[in-house]
A protein has these predicted regions:
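N-terminal signal-anchor transmembrane alpha helix
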Residues: 8-35
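Membrane-interface helix termini and inter-helical loops of multi-pass transporters
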Residues: 38-51
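Short aromatic-rich membrane-water interface segments that cap or initiate transmembrane helices
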Residues: 48-61
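Core segments of transmembrane alpha-helices
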Residues: 63-74, 95-98, 122
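Membrane-interfacial loop-to-transmembrane alpha-helix junctions, especially the N-terminal start
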Residues: 83-92
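Membrane-interface helix caps and helix-loop-helix hairpins in membrane proteins
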Residues: 104-113, 160-165
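Membrane-helix boundary connector in multi-pass membrane proteins
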Residues: 106-112, 127-141
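Terminal transmembrane helical module of multi-pass membrane proteins
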Residues: 132, 136-165
Length: 165
């Protein structure tokens, strides 16, 4: 019985950082979406948007998938070597804060220019996280590739709104 209990505890110890981070990321995304709600209904429709802007339904679906990947990247970073873990988790936290601040600055504050500054900083933080992960945590890099591509596209959409409004 003790051996089975030990295996369960060990398995939970491996899985818990992934699960908790995914839940945290999805919760932060939900809070951000609540802050965006009014601007999405009243302000955003009046903006000139890029012809490449996807239909509205794409955004919550894409972000939900990305938040799961971001959470998995946290779990992978959590299990990285002790000498790498601190920097990886630090940069993961920085990108998380910037990700949330983009929604606040672009939608809640209704400031595309502030959003542009934040998304550029977010892109830098994601690239730094990926570079620091290259030896210690390849799973995190794999999780962040689609995130980086989506952020680059979002930066283009943000820049378009800045330039044409």
């Amino acid at each position: 019985m003790k051996n089975k209990e030990m295996k369960t505890r060990t398995l939970w110890g491996r899985v818990a950082p992934y699960a908790l981070a995914v839940v945290l990321c999805l919760a932060l995304g939900w809070v951000a979406s609540m802050l965006q709600r009014e601007a999405l209904a009243e302000w955003y429709p009046s903006l000139a948007k890029s012809p490449l802007t996807p239909p509205g339904i794409v955004f919550p679906l894409a972000w939900s998938a990305l938040y799961v990947l971001i959470g998995i990247a946290f779990g992978a970073a959590w299990h990285a070597s002790a000498e790498s873990r601190g920097a990886l988790l630090g940069w993961w936290g920085v990108q998380c804060v910037l990700n949330f601040l983009w929604s606040v600055s672009f939608f809640y504050a209704r400031s595309p220019w502030a959003g542009m500054v934040v998304i550029v900083a977010l892109l830098v933080a994601v690239v730094v996280f990926m570079v620091k992960s290259r030896r210690a945590c390849r799973v995190a890099i794999g999780c962040f590739v689609p995130y980086l591509l989506w952020l680059a596209f979002a930066a283009y959409l943000n820049a378009y709104v800045c330039l044409y409004n």
